[in-house]
Amino acid sequence: MLSQVLPGLVDINTTLGYQGATGAGTGIVLDPNGDVLTNNHVIEGATEITAVSLANSITYPVDVIGFDRANDIAVVRLRGANGLPTAVLGSSSALAVGDPIAAIGNSNGTGGAPSYAPGNVTQLGASVRASDEAGGGARELFDLIRVAAEIRPGDSGGPLVNSAGQVVGVTVAATLNYHMGGVSGREGFAIPIDRAIGIANQIRSGAPSPSVHLGDTAFIGVGIADAPPFGGPPGAVVRQVLPDTPAGMAGLRAGDVITAVDGIPVNAAADLSNIIDQRRPGNTVVLSWIDRVGNPRTAPVVLAKGPVG
């Protein structure tokens, strides 16, 4: 099975320049010219991305084609790639509880020989709350394949394969910045491949939507978190303001609470991310926030080009 699957995979490595960190994950090759399916959280926050093909061991610079944050799907392109083997795709609709599966990936982000975690399907249509430290706040992921298999950080974005070696899911594993609530050490989740490919095809066709973002990411330059449920206004709490960014120039400070963008309410950190996803670098938006002493503030902000997602 491994010999059938491995040539259609890549190891993804990211530099998170604003966080002073690095990350790693896995990708599934969709096209000989280097279109690759992975998780959004694998590339989120990246200022530089490279990928190593398991078919030829070549390291490629990576461009982001687009992403769907709500469904945790992204499509990237390996710059200069051609003639790559592609993954063999199956259908997640044929899966049943008890079916044998295996998760293949870049376990713990170490590169080298790929990891192989056998197991079986334990639930279809599962949901899990994922805490995203890079993007702030938490998100609910729905309609997932739950598996009993030892999936680890670095496996994210890699294939869940059936006994025929066909890709039936995209693994969603905990990473240093992405944590699954209530998940034991020997289980994991995957996005059904039928849904993942539908989103990937939309991204590759250049069709944006309320959930799909194409091209460069707009950026205001803040680290955010959900506001506490009690004791203050709902919104996105500013944890950090990066220097020389639109937010800093507008006067935002750590401890402020962003409450709206262009009059659209921001009730949680994810709301702010979703609104900015639909804007482009160079667009002007009107930010509304409550400052640390409780004063309402409003200012126009020109969005900059920022890290992915």
Where are the model-predicted features located?
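Catalytic-histidine neighborhood of serine endopeptidases
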Residues: P32-D72, A81-G83, S273
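A conserved glycine-rich beta-strand in the N-terminal activation segment of trypsin-fold
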Residues: M1, N13-D35, T50, I58-P61, ...
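Active-site substrate-binding loop(s) of clan PA
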Residues: D63-I65, N82-G112, Y116, I191, ...
